Amino acid sequence: MDQRRLVLFLVFSLSLVMLWNAWLKQSQPAPTAVTATAGVEGAGVPTPTTGVAPGATTAVPGVPGAATASTAPRMVVRTDLMVAEVSAQGGDIVRLELAQHKATADKTKNFVLFDDGTIHLYAAQSGLIGEDLPTHKTTFALPQGEQVLKEGEDRLVVRLEAPEQDGVKVTKVMTFHRGNYLVDVAYEIVNSSERTLSPHAYYQLTRDGKPAESVEAFGVTTFTGPAFYTDAEKFQKVQFEEIAEGKAKFVKKASDGWIAMVQHYFVSAWLPQGGTEREFFAQKVGNDLYSAGVIVPVAAIQPGQSGRVEASLYAGPQEQDKLEDIAPGLDLVVDYGWLTVIAAPLFWVLSWIHGVVGNWGWAIIIVTILIKLMFFPLSAASYKSMAKMRVLGPRMQRLKELYGNDKAKMQQEMMEMYRKEKINPLGGCLPILVQIPVFISLYWVLLGSVEMRQAPWLGWIQDLSAKDPYFILPVIMGVSMLIQMKLNPTPPDPIQAKVMMAMPVIFTFMFLWFPSGLVLYWVVNNILSIAQQWQITRMIESEKSGAKPA
């Protein structure tokens, strides 16, 4: 029994080591500034496989002296949730700050999602495909001054004018909403020429291949890259390496769906209107620069007529209760790793409790109590087994003295003693075995849920997704583990006994770097386990106190 218990502890320790390594990587300093020589303007204009009008071209005409995205004039748009910088080149959103989410390294600054090269290259681009139609490389005329969503207004409409070409006038209309991370992007096309227009619209996300944060656990990296969704194929993630090697597998054509760029905690996604055929693409467009997007057809526009095409851009946090309402399957961008089947309902319960108590730390404590109650019968049986083993300690010591040189005989006598006393030798291992998947699932919930990011509990714990700044919880956890060890029967093998006593020290050291929310769960779980085990041990020892050893 002791050997099996030791093996389980070692397996659990290995799990903790892997989680610890993952958290150390996640906690590394932010990446250094991008040194790429080309910006997002290096992304090309995509080409639809069908439907381009005869004589139309997707080539972008050269514009002498045209400004790049980094040097073109910009317009700042402010809402209650975001600060966006829109470039005159293409009307692209080349920088986006999220006002309700602070930077990891400096909490006095807003988190930057789209970036123009300070740390990353990342932009939302769009345009039209067809002869002389504006693309993301066309210079638009911007409104004068900063555009601000004023008090009492629910939306802010910004109009960008493209140069008229051969009787075709195009206006890019961007609509920002109060309390929403959605931006509606429409193209209004007025055809004053003598030809029929059959254009396509494209919407793409262009970014470098560097992960926003390096996170790895159990061989699974927190995903950074494009993701496609359709009703037919559902959610498909594509690695940047697969795009570079031309091996990316995803749905190419569909009548529904969206394209997203996923990273830790945040996501951007182009959401075309439903019911129209569309083509998806992903390509490498520069040195460590990738573009993924969608192409949709625009209904033919006769001479003297006008047309309009629209898509929505979501750029914000992976708030699970809101994503599924925005678009089908958008909530799948939240990455819980290979234990999603446990982690997803665990987060749902946490979220519901948080809605009642208003604090994620207290929600974790309540969930821990509920989990403990759920496994109470199993834990009780296990602790009874360990308590009986503790009572039988003197008899086991005598067996060791009698048969110490005959391992087989000693094992035989011990098993006979277990049988007579109705003790399950594996009973003490079950609580540890059961908690491993729950422990790992909670780790992924804390790691992958933006709701936990920078969420305070009380006092010194101001971010449940970060380590305890003063290591108070890990020390309490280590002490609680030591108390638990004292309640367990002492292994007859001195080496095993020393290894078991070293576990609290080893675990405490590793837990120093774990998210404080996870340590909080483990501390509360240990305290509840100690109370339950102490009560059961006291009861068993009282029952056996008058019995004579066999």
Swiss-Prot record:
It is found in: Cell inner membrane. It comes from Aromatoleum aromaticum (strain DSM 19018 / LMG 30748 / EbN1). It comes from the Bacteria. This is Membrane protein insertase YidC. Interacts with the Sec translocase complex via SecD. Specifically interacts with transmembrane segments of nascent integral membrane proteins during membrane integration. Belongs to the OXA1/ALB3/YidC family. Type 1 subfamily. GO terms for biological process: protein insertion into membrane; protein transport. HAMAP family: YidC_type1 (MF_01810). CDD domains: 5TM_YidC_Alb3, EcYidC-like_peri. Its main location: membrane.
